[in-house]
Amino acid sequence: TIVANIEGSLLDSYGYVKDDFLIVDVVGIIYKLYNSIGMKVPTVSELREMVKCDELTWKMYELGATCSLNQCEKATTTKRVMKYKPKEIKELAAFIAGIRPGFKSLIDGFLNRLEYTNGEKAIDELLQDCFHYMLYQEAVMKIFSWLGIPMKDSYDTIKKISKKKLKGEALKKVEDTLKEHWVNNIGNLDNFEPVYKVIKDSARYSFNAPHALAMANDSLYEAWMKAHYTSKFYEVTLNHYQEKGDKNKVFALIKEVTSIFGFRMGTYEYGKDNSKFTIDDNTKTIYPV
């Protein structure tokens, strides 16, 4: 076996696939949460059934109870998810993809659930599964494929745009090629420019669909626990972030659980375990460390 340390862009130039090893904190939290109630972490299929039409879980997003919910806890994102009020996994995945920078010009209409069109009926029909928006890289590839551009060329073009490698003549060549295929399929260039702008923006910053869906699942694993086992959720997460020394997250969790769920902070008491956070369900009291 040969092990080599090679910079990512060099690997790309040789056509190799690189592996990224990431430590994802949310996975550990999810395990702790379900373990705390004696439940094995549900499979994704099981999770889908658990949250399907489950008003309590989806209410967490509507209320803005998003602290520690993956991808939704920044103040600006919380306001946005409260406005959008996702009610199914498909919508939450779309929301997570939609808050990327490349979707900035379209985000307001999306959050307000306004009917959207690309201006071309054929393109809209292609993108029915993502509300007619180019939310994902796959949506752009689907358009390229429909225009008759080979899949390999589609992938390479999106990759180069995303890494800002296409400039000047190279970028113009891509644009001219797209125009040619557009005219062949649609017959005119009336709506080419606005669609092409969205394609460029989307290719630069958009997620692929499985990435957005995986993040939505992570978020929902936590949202379900917060909705159905509220005290356990906060007990586990408060202790998790206390152990990590993340005082800001501890403060945010306490602020949320007291303001939204009506819990209160207790005081140090004899006979209580003061080495960690504990929550008394009967009195809705959080005993501090």
Where are these regions (language model features)?
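Noncatalytic, beta-rich nucleic-acid-contacting surfaces in large DNA/RNA-processing enzymes
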Residues: 1-289
